[in-house]
A protein has these predicted regions:
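Catalytic loop of short-chain dehydrogenase/reductase
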Residues: 124-156, 161-170
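Conserved glycine-rich cofactor-binding loop
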Residues: 14-15
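A short, exposed helix-loop element centered on a Lys and neighboring polar residues
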Residues: 112-113, 162
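Substrate-binding pocket helix/loop in short-chain dehydrogenase/reductase
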Residues: 88-89, 96-99, 196
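Short, small/polar-rich loop/turn modules that mediate ligand/substrate recognition or access, typified
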Residues: 169, 174, 225-226
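C-terminal substrate-recognition "lid" of short-chain dehydrogenase/reductases
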Residues: 207-231, 236
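Conserved NAD(P)H cofactor-binding loop of Rossmann-fold oxidoreductase domains
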Residues: 80-85, 233-234
């Protein structure tokens, strides 16, 4: 495969938003390295599926290495994998803490560090793009959804998005974040949909396509970096 074809790494890619992103990046002409803890092989020669726990410090470097080995480069990274545990703060356990920080922070760190290093080896002034997935709960906390660990970890991603955007702006790597509201995915039981829809001023849950389109917009928006793009049906604006 030509080393001039752009290459994206997408985590949490086996279902939901991640699976939608794999299809979207292929439509943009990218080869894709798709990771999830459990993921089946793809019949598409432009998609390399790699099973692995993103919380394992060895998984991120392995994904970047395989992207370069199979496709020759890395141009985009979508840190889609994430864990959300809603509990009262005093009920969180050490296991909860390790799980959430392992995926949301440790997984982000080791993969993004290696991915940016690979992007910097690309020629030209537009070398790469990182997109993180956050949550609108950081900006609009709700008594109905106690989420201190999400705020701790995803809030950190919002902050590091701005930090990395400035650090690498002059070197051709952009860094942005999408902060979704509640999205209609298999993780939400159908009987909860009405209640979840009521938490958004627009009166509905988000769809997978809403997030995929936001991310592909950022992928092509060359003047956007350091952006926290809320795709939350108005949640972050208020009620």
């Amino acid at each position: 495969m030509s080393s001039e074809q752009k290459v994206a790494i997408i985590t949490g890619a086996s279902q939901g938003i991640g699976a939608g992103l794999v299809q979207a990046y292929r439509k943009l002409g990218y080869a894709v390295v798709a990771n999830s803890r459990h993921i089946t092989p793809s019949s598409d020669p432009g998609v390399l599926t790699v099973p692995g726990d993103i919380a394992d410090p060895e998984t991120g470097p392995r994904l970047v290495g395989l992207a370069v080995e199979h496709f020759g480069r890395v141009d985009a990274l979508v840190n889609n994998a994430g864990v959300f545990v809603a509990k009262p703060f005093t009920d969180y356990t050490s296991a909860d803490f390790d799980l959430v920080t392992g995926v949301n922070l440790r997984g982000f760190f080791y993969l993004t560090q290696r991915a940016i290093a690979a992007m910097l080896r690309n020629e030209g002034t537009r070398r790469g793009h990182v997109v993180n997935i956050s949550t609108s709960l950081i900006d609009h906390a709700s008594t109905a959804v106690p989420s201190a660990l999400a705020s701790l970890t995803k809030g950190g991603l919002n902050a590091v998005t701005r930090s990395l955007a400035i650090e690498y702006a002059a070197r051709g790597v952009r860094v942005n974040t999408v902060a979704p509201g509640i999205i209609r995915t298999p993780m939400h039981a159908v009987e909860t949909h009405d209640a979840l829809a009521s938490m958004h001023p627009v009166g509905r849950m988000g769809d997978i396509a809403d997030i995929v389109e936001a991310i592909t917009y950022l992928e092509t928006a060359e003047f956007d970096t350091g952006e926290i793009l809320h795709v939350d049906g108005g949640q972050s604006a208020g009620h």
